Structure formats: structure tokens, C-alpha cells
Design a protein with these regions (language model features):
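Hydrophobic alpha-helical segments with strong N-terminal bias
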Residues: 1-2, 30, 100, 159
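Bacterial N-terminal signal peptides
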Residues: 2-12
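Short secondary-structure transition/capping segments
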Residues: 1, 18, 127-130, 187-196
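Sec/Tat signal peptide C-region and signal peptidase I cleavage site
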Residues: 13-17
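Covalent nucleotidyltransferase
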Residues: 18, 30-141
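Nucleic-acid 5′ end/cap handling module spanning
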Residues: 26-59, 143-213
């Protein structure tokens, strides 16, 4: 019938990943947060990467087809981080991590910025030295532990934010030191930017026209 022909004329949308990893997600910063409880780091504008001990995946659960050398020697320990190409280079990180046939030239510009160990049962205060030791033991320049610091008050936090943004960074992340790794959004992880945007989930990539196609 005509209805069936009409449906068949359009390709099916790609299925959403059914095995999205259970990740810790960030809430938006609000004034009055007890800053003495938090570690602060740069918010890297890249693609969320989750190493489950065998496979590198995105936040949505899609497999990242990195070159074999990129993950060679990685531990069976899960690592949570950001696949990052540098400040102001989100488009390169995004296009590279989507490649079905990974290219060495593009991937040589990607770093895995590790900010947590989801499988560790300790608090973030306890996970942090374990994370730093693990990354150091790998000895791979493209795998780096995200530097963490403390700030004394809101004025110091805002000053750090503006220095980071002026240098080309996206913003800051605040991680509660006493928190366990729990999936979902909570005040355990906070994001702070000079402006906040609304998150949207991509369900399909369709061909288009124009300079952004």
C-alpha cells in the first residue's frame, strides 16, 4: 500500500546504544556551594570517553574505534575521562572519535584526560591518588590525569574560571572529595561556565548542505 511504500522510502534512524555506561553526570553550579568540600579542575571541551577495561566507549555507549596503539597496555580497571584535542578544538575531537576507520594522524592529536576511576570503591579523595598513580604507571603521553586543585572561596573560584576561559578553556568542574562514584546527576560533580547551555542528545546524523554540513 502507499503507506508502506512511503515508510520504505526513508532509511531507518540508527538505533540508540542500549548499553550506555552508568556514568557520573554534572549538575550546574549554584552560588553557596561549600567549596572547601570540592576539588576543582578545567572542564575539557571534548568527547566523554569511558574505558570499561576492554573497550573505549562514548557516554551514549557507542564504541570508539581508536587505533590499536592508543589503548594498548591499558589496564582492566575502568577509567572515565575526556577525549580531548586541545582548547578550541572540539570539532577535531568529535570528528576523530566518530571515525569508522581510525587515522593515525588525527588520533596523534587526541589525549585521554582521565578524571575518575568508576570501579574504585573509595571516595574521590581516595580515588585521586590511585588515578594519578595508574596514569603515571602507563607512561603514555596521550593519557593524562586531569590536574585537580582546591580554591579558598568563591572569589578565587571566579578568578580561576575567568583565567581559564581567557586562555581558551570551556570552564571548570568541581568534584566533591567525600563522594563515592555514583551514576546520574548529583552535587558530587558540578560544572561551571561563564554561560550555561542546554544539553541535547544526538539520535541521528543526517546529510545536509551548507558550511556546517
Amino acid at each position: 500500500c502507499l503507506a508502506l511504500l512511503a515508510i520504505a522510502a526513508f532509511p531507518a534512524l540508527p538505533a540508540l546504544a542500549a548499553d550506555a555506561p552508568a556514568l557520573l553526570l554534572a549538575q550546574v553550579y549554584r552560588p553557596g556551594l561549600p567549596l572547601q568540600d570540592y576539588w576543582v579542575s578545567e572542564k575539557y571541551d571534548g568527547v566523554r570517553g569511558f574505558w570499561d577495561g576492554r573497550t573505549l566507549r562514548t557516554r551514549g555507549g557507542e564504541t570508539v574505534r581508536a587505533p590499536a596503539w592508543f589503548t594498548a597496555g591499558w589496564p582492566e580497571v575502568p577509567m572515565d575521562g575526556e577525549l580531548w584535542a586541545g582548547r578550541g578544538r572540539f570539532s577535531h575531537a568529535q570528528s576523530t572519535t566518530r571515525q569508522q576507520q581510525p587515522g593515525d594522524v588525527a588520533w596523534r592529536q587526541i589525549r585521554f584526560m582521565v578524571f575518575d576511576l568508576p570501579g574504585d570503591k573509595g571516595t574521590f579523595d581516595q580515588r585521586l591518588p590511585a588515578l594519578n598513580a595508574l596514569v603515571e604507571s602507563l607512561g603514555q603521553p596521550w593519557v593524562q590525569a586531569v590536574p585537580q586543585r582546591r580554591v579558598a572561596n568563591d572569589a578565587a573560584l571566579q578568578a580561576l574560571l575567568h583565567r581559564t576561559v581567557r586562555a581558551g578553556g570551556e570552564g571548570l568542574m568541581l568534584h566533591r572529595g567525600a563522594s563515592l562514584y555514583r551514576a546520574g546527576r548529583s552535587d558530587d560533580l558540578i560544572k561551571l561556565k561563564t554561560h550555561e547551555d542546554t544539553e541535547a542528545r544526538v539520535i541521528a546524523h543526517l546529510p545536509g548542505k551548507g558550511r556546517h554540513a
